[in-house]
Each structure stands twice: as structure tokens, then as C-alpha cells.
């Protein structure tokens, strides 16, 4: 099973979700993309440092924009916000598009830490980790 995490710029939330999912859940493979990626942008320094500290994982790559091929390959497309979910559905359609909180049985959006301090990044990281732990307990992820 392939899972695709989507956020705005593919510099904070979706790369964190990708690494958390891949490092903690080994029955599927995750990737991440952004809806509005600035050419040459990379994962934020704060997100990178947290992932290095928590998982020993150095994410050093350019942000990638969501493309048709990504949509075709993924069984689940998981956004961080309702607005992102609507945008993905507008562009590509989408019976397989959910927000992370929706899949976890919660409502609302995962806060965007972009431009904030490390404390906010840590809160976002912790929230994403908690939500991913929750969704991977469901039968649909236990195949």
C-alpha cells in the first residue's frame, strides 16, 4: 500500500508525516508532496532538526509538487487541512483523499508551523506522530 501525505509547500508537515509513517509503520510506504511548491525550496531547518533528533533521519531534498502520477500510485492521499483536501479534489477528483485528522476520527486541521519557532514545530511534530499512530491501528492499515 502506498500513502501520500500532502501539505502546502512540502517543507514542514508532509515531510514530517512521511518520515514518521515510514519509520514507525512498515506495512506500507509513504511519500510526500506539496500543492504550491516554490522552486528550489527544501525541508525547513526546524523540521529537519526534529527528524534528525527523533529518528536519526536526515531529510535533505528539494520539495516536490503533487503530480498526476503521484495520485495514480497512492491508495490514500492524506492532507493536513480541509482546504488542501478540497484543492486536491478540485484538481484531481478524489475518493481516496482524506485529512489526517479525518482518518484519525478527529476534526480540524494540523497547524502549519512554517515561519514559527521550534516549540511550534515540536507541537506539530507531536500531533502528526500521535495522529499517524492512531490511523495505523485501524484495520484498513493492517493488511
Question: Where are these predicted regions, by residue range?
Answer:
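Short, charged/polar low-complexity linear motifs in solvent-exposed/disordered segments
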Residues: 31, 77-78
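Conserved active-site segments centered on acidic
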Residues: 1-72, 140-143
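Helix N-cap/beta->alpha junction signal
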Residues: 70, 81-82
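Phosphate-binding/catalytic loops
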Residues: 76, 82-143
Amino acid at each position: 500500500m502506498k500513502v501520500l501525505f500532502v501539505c502546502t509547500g512540502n517543507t514542514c508537515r508532509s515531510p514530517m508525516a512521511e518520515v514518521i509513517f515510514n519509520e514507525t509503520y512498515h506495512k506500507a510506504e509513504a511519500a510526500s508532496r506539496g500543492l504550491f511548491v516554490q522552486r528550489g525550496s527544501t525541508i525547513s531547518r526546524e523540521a529537519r532538526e526534529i527528524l534528525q533528533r527523533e529518528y536519526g533521519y536526515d531529510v535533505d531534498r528539494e520539495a516536490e509538487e503533487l503530480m498526476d502520477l503521484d495520485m495514480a500510485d497512492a491508495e490514500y492521499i492524506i492532507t493536513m487541512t480541509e482546504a488542501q483536501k478540497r484543492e486536491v479534489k478540485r484538481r484531481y477528483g478524489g475518493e481516496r483523499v482524506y485529512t489526517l485528522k479525518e482518518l484519525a476520527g478527529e476534526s480540524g486541521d494540523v497547524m502549519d508551523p512554517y515561519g514559527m519557532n521550534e516549540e511550534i514545530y515540536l507541537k506539530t511534530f507531536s500531533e502528526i506522530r500521535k495522529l499517524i499512530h492512531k490511523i495505523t491501528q485501524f484495520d484498513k492499515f493492517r493488511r
